[in-house]
Amino acid sequence: CVVVQRKTPAADGYDAVQLGLVEFAKASRVKKPAAGHLKKAGADGVKFLRELRLGAGNGDMKAGDRILVEEFKPQDKVDVIGVSKGRGFAGVVKRHHFGGGEGSHGSMFHRAPGSIGASSFPSRVFPGMKMGGQMCSQRVTVRHLEVVQVDTDDNVLMVKGAVPGPNGSYVLVRRAKR
């Protein structure tokens, strides 16, 4: 990662850094307005820009600095944040573990949700009712994973445990908060 911009309370009203992730092989692939913004930081071209708020004691970063895996060492505890694998539109049996109905004996109620509310009073469905819909594909934080190995040559961090998202997805790794 490269620090593209440093936001300060004096200029922007809050303390944060803007990070550029995954550098392009060609700087020509970056749109012109973004290229001007990146040029100030000395970054040729990046695929993603992410902004992270800073807490107290993190004020030494400035535009152009690189963040590498050397920040971590084996046996450190980290939190890994990513987007979980999407499972598309799912019904209530898969999504909310509803029991469903009889499979035979003349039943025609197999995987349906059943009743979703009363009749004339309240004449509406209450918010938060469990129904079918988009399953997964949301931000997930896996806490307290242990750093097993740090490969500074390839800038790779190896952790023990589950990492959210499909193979090849991008994740945010931070020191464990607790």
Please describe what each predicted stretch is:
Residues C1-R178:
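Extended basic (Lys/Arg/His-rich) segments that typically form rRNA-contacting surfaces
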